[in-house]
Amino acid sequence: MQPTLFIDRDGTLIDEPKTDFQIDSLEKLKLEPKVIPALLRLKAKYRFVIVSNQDGLGTDAFPQTNFDKPHNVMMALFESQGITFDEVLICPHKPEENCLCRKPKIKLLDHYIRKNLFDIDRSFVIGDRETDMQLAENLGIRAIQYDPQKMNWDLIAEKLLGETVTNCGKRPPRFAEVIRQTKETDIKVQVWLDEAGVNEIKTGVGFFDHMLDQIATHGGFRMNVQCKGDLWIDEHHTVEDTALALGQALKQAIGDKRGIARFGFVLPMDECKAECALDLSGRPWIKFNACFKRDKVGDFSTELTEHFFQSLAFSMLATLHLNVTGNNDHHKIESLFKAFGRTLRQAIRIEGNEMPSSKGVL
């Protein structure tokens, strides 16, 4: 069985026009940024299959010839750069036709399933829509949701290849596993500080899962987080205890801190301005400055943002300063998690062999 990437076409490999959502002319054909370099990096490890919904293909509203011309040029362009696709699987039906082959249904991939043609543990669906995520779930494999800003092709390749980003290779890989069980939560956290990859995060709080993924993605490491908490009450215990377990796991994985950079500072500028300063000092402290207008973002209470970072800092024994300004609460919270991830990436990087302290101990 071969590791396979089942890749969406419109909005993932090529730009999808927001006017009519059809690529029916050469003028509309535009590759997504960095898709060719990423696929070239991935092709030695994965087979590529395109899986695409094309609403009304072959009808007067979307003639087959209008589809074929830009599609064939796209395929020729990929092939000219050394990228080939084993198959191109297309559902031509509209949603109201209720067919069996339209994503997220799996009829298009029936032969892959019946003949065991893909490695379930090492195959992925890559796409920009929720239907792609549901397709992966129906196939029993993992998914990566493409987004040109938040999860672009560079990051996808980094995740799938699990590239070493923080360790020069002269030390054993830095790994830790923490299991934390209380009457309120049952948590398992695993962190691999010296490899990037696909993170498996399930806490039952969707927005929180996304924020934790931001830490690992921008921190350049891989982690798994599984949490079963008393969400019938609220998400407080889940967020707090996950922070405590994650902080403990990071502390254990970092080890005695010999050779690490220790400090990190980042000031990313987007529509929000987020500042983060971190010292893996062994002395826990936090200064947090953020104001939120909304009580919740999705299923996540905004007041828990500060509590998460406070619990994390004290569990890691780290000094942490966070500040954010902006107008959109979703973006402000996300920028804090991203900034922390980028700062942590600097602090855990191995630079030598010395203890980064005049005291000789941290």
Swiss-Prot record:
It holds the Pfam family Hydrolase_like. Mg(2+) binds at D8, D10, D128. Zn(2+) binds at C91, H93, C99, C101. Residues 174-362 are annotated as: Imidazoleglycerol-phosphate dehydratase. Pathway: Amino-acid biosynthesis; L-histidine biosynthesis; L-histidine from 5-phospho-alpha-D-ribose 1-diphosphate: step 6/9; Amino-acid biosynthesis; L-histidine biosynthesis; L-histidine from 5-phospho-alpha-D-ribose 1-diphosphate: step 8/9. GO terms for molecular function: histidinol-phosphatase activity; imidazoleglycerol-phosphate dehydratase activity; metal ion binding. NCBIfam families: HAD-SF-IIIA, hisB_Nterm, Histidinol-ppas, PRK00951.2-1, PRK00951.2-4, PRK05446.1. This is Histidine biosynthesis bifunctional protein HisB.
